[in-house]
């Protein structure tokens, strides 16, 4: 992590918050700065961008409803607000974290693997969840079924080395954690598809291996080629 870039981001983001910037401006500013703060390009930065405004489903009262979460990174739901020093805004964001964590549980993710984040891009609150109560047949889990336990807090507005280190740990715990990625087609394409770093780094080896195998066993290669052409 580049601490100088993080410090620069924290200073400017706090100035934006103090001047009354809306949530979207803060969120877009964060997204634009993440690649310079994390120059090693961890997987979750791309996931953070692609998971923006993800479609989710959960219940409110006795009704199932649909919504859009600010960001989903693997099994972590993120809610951004414009200024978490204002209690009314914090409370609204806290409730939405519960909604979005319920939505992750509704798609089959075990509660112990779900984490939630509430942030204004400068202050970061991290939560684990517990499922409480039961749901009736045909109904989804909702915020009333989610109990949040705060497990980490970071305040980058302090602009201290200690808080910057805490943020690095926070990111590792909530965004870059092991086994947090969903195993689906989108993830596989991101990791191994034609636009991935894996592809660009290894395609020449694969190509040479295939060409050599085809030249050594042309009859077998012709059979395989025919099978794929008729697939």
Annotate each predicted stretch with a short phrase.
Residues 4-55:
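Acidic-basic catalytic patches of nuclease active cores, encompassing PD-(D/E)XK
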Residues 14, 18, 22, 26, ...:
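Conserved aromatic-histidine-acidic binding/catalytic patches
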Residues 25, 29-33, 92-100, 166, ...:
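Alpha-helical scaffold elements adjacent to nucleotide-binding pockets in ATP/GTP-utilizing enzyme cores
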Residues 33, 37, 100-103, 107:
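Conserved short hydrophobic interaction patches
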Residues 42-74:
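Active-site metal-binding core of divalent-cation-utilizing nuclease and nuclease-like domains
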Residues 63, 74-89, 102-231:
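Charged, often flexible domain-edge or linker segments that flank or initiate folded functional domains
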Residues 68-71, 80, 94-100:
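Well-ordered mid-protein domain cores that form the structural environment of catalytic cofactors
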């Amino acid at each position: 992590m580049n601490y100088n870039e993080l410090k620069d981001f924290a200073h400017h983001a706090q100035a934006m918050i103090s001047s009354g910037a809306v949530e979207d401006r803060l969120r877009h500013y964060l997204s634009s700065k993440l690649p310079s703060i994390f120059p090693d390009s961890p997987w979750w930065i791309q996931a953070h961008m692609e998971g923006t405004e993800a479609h989710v489903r959960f219940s409110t009262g006795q009704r199932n409803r649909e919504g859009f979460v600010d960001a989903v990174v693997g099994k972590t739901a993120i809610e951004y607000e414009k200024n978490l020093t204002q209690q009314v805004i914090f409370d609204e964001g806290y409730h939405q974290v519960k909604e979005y964590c319920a939505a992750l549980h509704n798609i089959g993710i075990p509660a112990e693997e779900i984490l939630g984040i509430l942030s204004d891009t400068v202050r970061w609150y991290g939560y684990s969840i517990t499922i409480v109560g039961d749901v009736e047949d045909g109904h989804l889990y909702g915020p009333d079924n989610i109990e949040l336990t705060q497990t980490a807090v970071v305040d980058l507005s302090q602009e201290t080395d200690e808080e910057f280190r805490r943020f690095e740990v926070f990111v590792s715990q909530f965004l870059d954690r092991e086994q947090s990625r969903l195993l689906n087609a989108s993830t596989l394409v991101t990791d191994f598809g034609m636009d991935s770093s894996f592809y660009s780094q290894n395609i020449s080896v694969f190509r040479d291996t295939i060409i050599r195998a085809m030249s050594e066993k042309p009859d077998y290669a012709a059979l395989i080629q025919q099978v794929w052409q008729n697939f």
